[in-house]
From Swiss-Prot:
Entry GO terms, CC: cytoplasm
EC main group: transferase
Protein source organism: Chromobacterium violaceum (strain ATCC 12472 / DSM 30191 / JCM 1249 / CCUG 213 / NBRC 12614 / NCIMB 9131 / NCTC 9757 / MK)
Mitochondrion listed as a keyword: no
Family: Belongs to the thiamine-phosphate synthase family.
SUPFAM superfamilies per UniProt: Thiamin phosphate synthase (SSF51391)
Protein task: Condenses 4-methyl-5-(beta-hydroxyethyl)thiazole monophosphate (THZ-P) and 2-methyl-4-amino-5-hydroxymethyl pyrimidine pyrophosphate (HMP-PP) to form thiamine monophosphate (TMP).
Annotated binding of Mg(2+), by residue: D70, D89
Molecular-function GO terms, alphabetical: magnesium ion binding; thiamine-phosphate diphosphorylase activity
Pathway(s) per entry: Cofactor biosynthesis; thiamine diphosphate biosynthesis; thiamine phosphate from 4-amino-2-methyl-5-diphosphomethylpyrimidine and 4-methyl-5-(2-phosphoethyl)-thiazole: step 1/1
Binding-site residues for 4-amino-2-methyl-5-(diphosphooxymethyl)pyrimidine, renumbered to this chain: Q37, Y38, R39, D40, K41, N69, S108, K138
GO biological process: thiamine biosynthetic process; thiamine diphosphate biosynthetic process
Protein name, as recorded: Thiamine-phosphate synthase
Upper classification of the organism: Bacteria, Pseudomonadati, Pseudomonadota, Betaproteobacteria, Neisseriales
Name of the encoding gene: thiE
EC number: 2.5.1.3
Length: 207
């Protein structure tokens, strides 16, 4: 059975060089991130393999899950904990067959509970809803109501909130029932990533 994704879920931004990426990821993990998703949309396979391998090492050192965005082959090659798939990123059932019963497979469900139902039926182990707040990373994303987390709980789903989450609004997502909060800018654009991670992770200690 796949492990649940819970607490602070760090998602790396595009375009960072190795040193900056690894330093910020280490800070997020030290601050309390319990999972980290490697998101890199470049076509440089060598860069992606190199960065993913080091990020996985950091996650192992901190006891955190390591998830690869949109690349089942890379996740399989390095033995990542799992993969996250968006609407156009691949087939959930095929990823489950390839990665096995214990892999974490996440699915972007945007603002639609029916996508969550379909993803779970296909073999997803968690579903992500967003943007729950206005997002700089995806400014044109549809707004996902926080009521989706009660709907997801009724399905027995491991549910993740994403989109515009920062220390000042994270509590609203947690109180609505999100099992995890996926954060990009609120962590990696912060002046102090470790401190931002502690503040975000702290919402789960209070629940």
């Amino acid at each position: 059975m796949p492990p649940r994704v819970e607490g602070l879920y760090a998602v790396t931004p595009d375009g960072l060089d190795d040193a900056r990426l690894f330093a910020l990821a280490a800070a997020a993990l030290a601050g309390g991130a319990r999972a980290l998703q490697y998101r890199d949309k470049s076509g440089d396979a060598g860069r992606r393999l190199r960065q993913a391998a080091e990020l996985q090492r950091l996650c192992r050192a901190h006891g955190a899950l390591f998830i690869v965005n949109d690349d089942v082959e890379l996740a399989e090659r390095i033995g990542a904990d799992g993969v996250h798939l968006g609407r156009d990123d691949g087939d959930i059932a095929a990823a489950r067959r390839r990665l096995g019963a214990d892999a974490v497979i996440g699915a972007s469900c945007y603002d639609r509970i029916e996508l969550a139902r379909a993803a779970l039926a296909a073999g997803a182990s968690y579903v992500a809803f967003g943007a729950v707040f206005p997002s700089r990373t995806k400014p044109h994303a549809a707004a996902a109501p926080l009521s989706l987390f009660a709907d997801a709980a009724a399905l027995g789903a491991n549910a993740v909130a994403i989109g515009g989450i920062a220390a000042g609004n994270a509590g609203r997502a947690v109180e609505a029932g999100a099992d995890a909060i996926a954060v990009i800018g609120g962590l990696f654009d912060a002046d102090d990533t470790a401190a931002a991670a502690r503040a975000l992770a702290g919402w789960f200690g209070a629940r």
